[in-house]
Amino acid sequence: MLISNEWLKEYVTIDDSVSNLAERITRTGIEVDDLIDYTKDIKNLVVGFVKSKEKHPDADKLNVCQVDIGEDEPVQIVCGAPNVDAGQYVIVAKVGGRLPGGIKIKRAKLRGERSEGMICSLQEIGISSNYIPKSFESGIYVFSESQVPGTDALQALYLDDQVMEFDLTPNRADALSMIGTAYEVAALYNTKMTKPETTSNELELSANDELTVTIENEDKVPYYSARVVHNVTIEPSPIWMQARLIKAGIRPINNVVDISNYVLLEYGQPLHMFDQDAIGSQQIVVRQANEGEKMTTLDDTERELLTSDIVITNGQTPIALAGVMGGDFSEVKEHTSNIVIEGAIFDSVSIRHTSRRLNLRSESSSRFEKGIATEFVDEAVDRACYLLQTYANGKVLKDRVSSGELGAFITPIDITADKINRTIGFDLSQNDIVTIFNQLGFDTEINDDVITVQVPSRRKDITIKEDLIEEVARIYGYDDIPSTLPVFEKVTSGQLTDRQYKTRMVKEVLEGAGLDQAITYSLVSKEDATAFAMQQRQTIDLLMPMSEAHASLRQSLLPHLIEAASYNVARKNKDVKLFEIGNVFFANGEGELPDQVEYLSGILTGDYVVNQWQGKKETVDFYLAKGVVDRVSEKLNLEFSYRRADIDGLHPGRTAEILLENKVVGFIGELHPTLAADNDLKRTYVFELNFDALMAVSVGYINYQPIPIFPGMSRDIALEVDQNIPAADLLSTIHAHGGNILKDTLVFDVYQGEHLEKGKKSIAIRLNYLDTEETLTDERVSKVQAEIEAALIEQGAVIR
């Protein structure tokens, strides 16, 4: 189940981040398997208005568009989408923007015409083609409603959102709906849950005058109801509704079908919409299928039915396969005007057997299989009527046509506070226990020491006292249960934690690389407090410092490491290689405890190799310092990438940010010549890493890798590219297309000058191939090499 935070806020308001909410939900029994951020890797995406469109003079399939993006003048964008036209509101990625997949938007010339941006499809902003409306599958997205040019496109699309993906166990079917999840969140945060509007303005005409409902076997179909809505207008649903469906993994179709799916997600109650005029009669009969009976479902497939299947009929012919899929001739089409809305309870075993036999698993069948909340059946139908009235101009007929019995909305269970306390191992008052049940939306009655809990039908997992005890424990918070000292019969020796072990390994790696560990003061001068800080936040100053040099808590380890290097050089120890693992501190406002983050930093200056027996003398440079950092990443089984950066205090051309999973976790670079001279240092290189961030991502470490027993191959490639293209971008493309046999790459030559155009450079790269399972063949390597070269050419490189 995919839960949109933006949608969830409609029912329950909490003051907490989505990541904290996900953590809290996980700790109380529903695992949040993933957190999907639709804003990730997207930058400078705005709404644009296409003011004009002209054919490209030199390309039949391209159009030259003038697009208003909220700036002083329209921008010219060359677009190849077949559906682009003047008068449209579209998604525009501005120059300097980014799109998923690492795509950077730059000024370009396409067949001689200037293009300053990109008009985007939904696929290009990260939406799967499985969920995109069919009208936009092969072209750009066009807003169906007027927008303000220049506004944030993600906000206009309701995609500035984070979505939690639940990995639900079968017993928690209540969380297969937004309202069920809202009840859970309201309980966790002790707040109120607000239900959506369900009341329509009804006509005097009664649905009973137009329709009858009959159930032939109430053991298989305990309840079936229908409501009628006239004069609906079939059109696209509102953008916000389409966005919520897309984020939930459902493709928008039209407003009527979308409302059916929307209510399914909202209440967990599957609905079906029939074209009333196509049903063929004024009666609905729900029965078992006849032996050998056939029907054609919505996917244009003729199905042969068994007597165990439940069908919805018009008295004669099946018009739907109950709980699984509708029939083709009664489906909602573009010309549909009158709607019959079905809300029912079907036998879960029958639905499971039918859906599995026909391989027709759907959102509806999965919910029927797990059991439906009787309290929501009619409410969900009423909600659909309200939405059809609001967003399809429908006229709702009064009354509900139904057959069968809904059954009990609640199940009473008696329990005592003493029973709960004896089970969970600590004492809660009766009032505390009742409060927790009320938070969950369970009504309670108290008779002396007995608490009668009215469990609603949505919580089918609660049937006995022990289930109620579990609810008390998890909502109270497993982490908040008081700790008690256990009684040990024997004492076992302690051991290092995973983090302690990894920290020791990192220290050993750095010491093996020739660095010495330093331990410096946490206090620095106010001037140095924010030097090299990766987060620009308020400093923490001492009220009564012992000296100006120790007046604030540091936000970087480097100021004192630079001071230590300067101290050593001044005393004739000119070859300095130091590292430190220590805490830095960031303020959180008055009265709040600061954030304490562990960093790893290093400094290298002078000669790296100084003894004759170690080999040729080698002076510290950028790549040597980078090699030290890479040793750390390799030991922690992490993969760093590097991106050119400008950081105060560092050389503007010899500095890079260090990224882990596309997030900046540190930097490396040469100390700015002015700062180095002020400290009497020659060329000096520093690095700093957020050690906490590394520990949070690292899931293992490498102690040993077997020596390959099969020979590898190497291929060299020379590329001519624009001089402003970093080698890292080329390496990223190479690795993305190298498959599992490309083991590593090495830039061994960079050339600019004679025989190259101005603004161009030549980069020579060695590609090392290896298969640990078998000997590589030339054909296999050549095939991968060809794919890599094609990708590089597409990126703009020329193979030399």
Swiss-Prot record:
Q: Which residues form the tRNA-binding domain?
A: 39-154
Kindly indicate whether the keyword Amino-acid biosynthesis belongs to this entry: no
Show where the FDX-ACB domain sits.
708-800
Q: Which domain of life is it from?
A: Bacteria
Please provide, in alphabetical order, the Gene Ontology terms of the cellular component aspect for this entry: phenylalanine-tRNA ligase complex
Report the InterPro entries cross-referenced here: aa-tRNA-synth_II/BPL/LPL (IPR045864), B3/B4_tRNA-bd (IPR005146), DNA-bd_dom_put_sf (IPR009061), Fdx_antiC-bd (IPR005121), Fdx_antiC-bd_sf (IPR036690), NA-bd_OB-fold (IPR012340), Phe-tRNA-ligase_IIc_bsu (IPR045060), Phe-tRNA-ligase_IIc_bsu_bact (IPR004532)
Subcellular compartments: Cytoplasm
* A Gene Ontology biological process term: phenylalanyl-tRNA aminoacylation
Q: What is its main location?
A: cytoplasm
In terms of CDD domains, this protein maps to:
PheRS_beta_core, tRNA_bind_bactPheRS
Question: What terms describe the molecular function in GO for this protein?
Answer: ATP binding; catalytic activity, acting on a protein; magnesium ion binding; phenylalanine-tRNA ligase activity; transferase activity; tRNA binding
**Pfam families membership:** B3_4, B5, FDX-ACB, tRNA_bind, tRNA_synthFbeta
The protein's enzyme class: ligase
Question: Which coenzyme or cofactor does it need?
Answer: Mg(2+)
Which positions fall inside the B5 domain?
Answer: 408-483
Its UniProt entry gives the catalysed reaction(s) as: tRNA(Phe) + L-phenylalanine + ATP = L-phenylalanyl-tRNA(Phe) + AMP + diphosphate + H(+)
Cite the record's note on assembly. Tetramer of two alpha and two beta subunits.
Family note: Belongs to the phenylalanyl-tRNA synthetase beta subunit family. Type 1 subfamily.
Designated name of the protein? Phenylalanine--tRNA ligase beta subunit
